[in-house]
UniProtKB/Swiss-Prot annotation:
Disulfide bonds: none annotated. The active site is at E244, C278. Pathway: Amino-acid degradation; L-arginine degradation via AST pathway; L-glutamate and succinate from L-arginine: step 4/5. Pfam families: Aldedh (PF00171). NAD(+) binds at G221, S222, S223, D224, T225, G226. InterPro entries: Ald_DH/histidinol_DH, Ald_DH_C, Ald_DH_CS_CYS, Ald_DH_CS_GLU, Ald_DH_N, Aldehyde_DH_dom, SuccinylGlu_semiald_DH_AstD. The keyword Oxidoreductase applies. It comes from the Bacteria. HAMAP family: Aldedh_AstD. This is N-succinylglutamate 5-semialdehyde dehydrogenase. GO terms for biological process: arginine catabolic process to glutamate; arginine catabolic process to succinate.
Length: 487
C-alpha cells in the first residue's frame, strides 16, 4: 500500500496500518500504513530540498500550476465529492459545494497575495524603498475531518502561491480525500517535493509538529489540540503558528416578522453539516414570552422532520452521519450531562445504531442550567437559552472563552448596530446563518478560537513575511557628510 507522497512519488509508510470508515455504513473507506517518524523526516527533507527551486520560480509560473490544479478539480468534482461523502458521511449535494470551494480558493488566493503582499516601491531622496514578501520555507499543514478537502486546501494553496514547500498531515479520519487531492496536484505539474503527504494518527502528527526543520505550522481543528500546539511553540518564536479552532457560537433571535425565515436560518446555523462546522451556532438565545414560544414551537416542528441518511442516498438528505460512531456516542453523552445539570430536552438526541454515526438533530433548553459549561459540542445539538432583555442576551452570548462566530436575527437596524458593537467574535452576521462567511474577508476568531486568520482572504499574511529594503542603483558618496567624518 503506497499511501504516502514523498519527493514526487507514492511510497509505503513504515508505521502501523490504520483505516478510515464510512460513518454511514461502517465499511472501510481507506486503508494504509501510517508515516513513522523516519517517514516524516524524509518528507520534511524532501520539502526542504524543493523549497529553493520552487521559491525561485517566478510568481506567474507558480500561479499557472495552481490554476491548473483548480481546473482539474472542476473536472473531477464528482469523484472527489464521492470521496468526501464516503469518509465524512456528508451528503453529495454538500460535498460538491466543498469541491467547488476548493477550486474557487485559487483565484481568491492569487488576488489576496497580490493585494496584501506582493511588491511595493516608494521613491526616496537618495534611492527607493522596496517592500517585498518572502516565503517562510517548509510549512506543516494539519487538516481537519469536517472539511477534509476545503480547509487544508485553504492553507496549502496560499502557501504554495507564496513560494513555500508543504508537508501535509490530514485527519486520520479522512485520508482518502487527502490522497485524491494530492493526486490532482501531481497531475497539475507540481514539482517533486513541493507538496508531501504523510498519513497517520497521533504519533505521525507529533513527529511532524516536533520536527526542527519546519518553519511554520498551520492548523485547523479542536481548541484542545490547538492550545497544546500553542504551548509547545511558546518558546520558539522562529516558527509561524496559525491556529483556526472551534467556537461556542451564539445566535440571538429577535422578535422578527418572518418567523419561518428565522427558523430556517437557525436550522442552517445549528444543523448544517450535521452541526460539524466550527461556525455552527451552539447556543440559541430566544426571547421569553409569546413570540419566543411561537418561534420555539416552529423550530421544534421543522427540526423534527429533518432526515439523516447515507451520503449518496436518493433523494438526498439534509444531514448525513457525523464523522464516526464514537463521535455520535459522545454527543449523546454530552446531552445526558446537560440534562443531569438541569437542561430540558425538547427533541432528545439518540444514536440510531451503535456502529454508525447517525444521530438526529436535537434541541435542549439549558436556561435552567446554573453554570452552563463553556464547551463546543461538535454536532447537531442546539442549546436554547431564554432571555428577558436584549442586553441580557448579549451578556450571556459573550460569556465564553471562544469568539469565532455570532449572529443576530432582527428586523431593526438599531438593534443590529448595538449587537455588532458589543458582541465579541471574529465573524458577526445579521439576518444570515452564523456559518455564512465570505472568502473575500478574513476568517477566524478571538479568544480560544484562534490566534490568526489562517484561511480565506488574510491567508497571504501568514504565508510570507515582509522584507523591507532601501535601494540605490549607484554607490555614491553622500553630498553632505555626518559631523566628524573627513574624506
Amino acid at each position: 500500500m503506497t499511501e504516502l507522497f514523498i519527493d514526487g512519488a507514492w511510497v509505503a509508510g513504515s508505521g502501523p496500518v490504520f483505516a478510515s470508515r464510512n460513518p454511514g455504513t461502517d465499511e472501510i473507506a481507506w486503508q494504509g500504513e501510517s508515516a513513522s517518524a523516519a517517514d516524516v523526516d524524509r518528507a520534511v527533507a524532501s520539502a526542504r530540498r524543493a523549497f529553493a527551486g520552487w521559491s525561485a520560480l517566478d510568481f506567474e509560473s507558480r500561479c499557472a500550476i495552481v490554476k491548473r490544479f483548480a481546473a482539474l478539480l472542476n473536472e473531477r468534482k464528482e469523484a472527489i465529492a464521492a470521496a468526501i461523502g464516503r469518509e465524512t458521511g456528508k451528503p453529495l449535494w454538500e460535498a460538491r459545494t466543498e469541491v467547488a470551494s476548493m477550486a474557487a480558493k485559487v483565484g481568491i488566493s492569487i488576488q489576496a497575495y497580490q493585494e496584501r503582499t506582493g511588491e511595493k516601491r516608494q521613491d526616496m531622496a537618495d534611492g527607493v524603498a522596496v517592500l517585498r514578501h518572502r516565503p517562510h520555507g517548509v510549512v506543516a499543514v494539519f487538516g481537519p475531518y469536517n472539511f477534509p478537502g476545503h480547509l487544508p486546501n485553504g492553507h496549502i494553496v496560499p502557501a504554495l502561491i507564496a513560494g513555500n514547500a508543504v508537508v501535509f498531515k490530514p485527519s486520520e479520519l479522512a485520508p482518502g480525500v487527502a490522497r485524491a487531492t494530492v493526486e490532482v496536484w501531481k497531475e497539475a505539474g507540481l514539482p517533486d517535493g513541493v507538496l508531501n503527504l504523510v498519513q497517520g494518527e497521533k504519533d505521525t502528527g507529533i513527529a511532524l509538529a516536533n520536527h526542527r526543520q519546519i518553519d511554520g505550522l498551520f492548523f485547523t481543528g479542536s481548541s484542545d489540540t490547538g492550545t497544546l500546539l500553542h504551548k509547545q511553540f511558546g518558546g520558539r518564536p522562529e516558527i509561524v503558528l496559525a491556529l483556526e479552532m472551534g467556537g461556542n457560537n451564539p445566535l440571538v433571535i429577535g422578535e422578527v416578522e418572518d418567523i419561518d425565515a428565522a427558523v430556517h436560518h437557525t436550522i442552517q446555523s445549528a444543523f448544517l453539516s450535521a452541526g460539524q462546522r466550527c461556525t455552527c451556532a451552539r447556543r440559541i438565545f430566544v426571547p421569553q414570552g409569546a413570540f419566543g414560544d411561537r418561534f420555539l414551537a416552529r423550530l421544534t416542528d421543522v427540526t423534527s422532520k429533518i432526515t439523516a441518511d447515507v451520503f449518496d442516498a436518493d433523494p438526498q438528505p439534509f444531514m448525513g452521519a457525523v464523522i464516526s460512531a464514537r463521535a455520535a456516542a459522545k454527543l449523546v453523552d454530552a446531552q445526558s450531562r446537560l440534562i443531569e445539570q438541569g437542561a430540558k430536552p425538547i427533541i432528545a438526541m439518540t444514536q440510531r445504531d451503535p456502529r454508525l454515526g447517525f444521530v438526529n438533530a436535537a434541541i435542549v433548553d439549558v436556561t435552567g442550567v446554573a453554570n452552563l459549561p463553556d464547551e463546543e459540542h461538535f454536532g447537531p445539538l442546539a442549546q436554547i437559552v431564554r432571555y428577558a432583555t436584549f442586553d441580557d442576551a448579549i451578556e450571556r452570548a459573550n460569556d465564553t472563552a471562544f469568539g469565532l462566530s455570532a449572529g443576530l436575527l432582527a428586523d431593526d437596524a438599531k438593534t443590529w448596530e448595538h449587537f455588532r458593537r458589543t458582541i465579541r467574535a471574529g465573524i458577526v452576521n445579521w439576518n444570515r446563518p452564523t456559518n455564512g462567511a465570505s472568502s473575500a474577508a478574513p476568517f477566524g476568531g478571538t479568544g480560544r478560537s484562534g490566534n490568526h486568520r489562517p484561511s480565506a482572504y488574510y491567508a497571504a499574511d501568514y504565508c510570507a513575511y515582509p522584507m523591507a529594503s532601501v535601494e540605490s542603483t549607484q554607490l555614491t558618496l553622500p553630498a553632505s557628510l555626518s559631523p566628524g567624518l573627513h574624506f
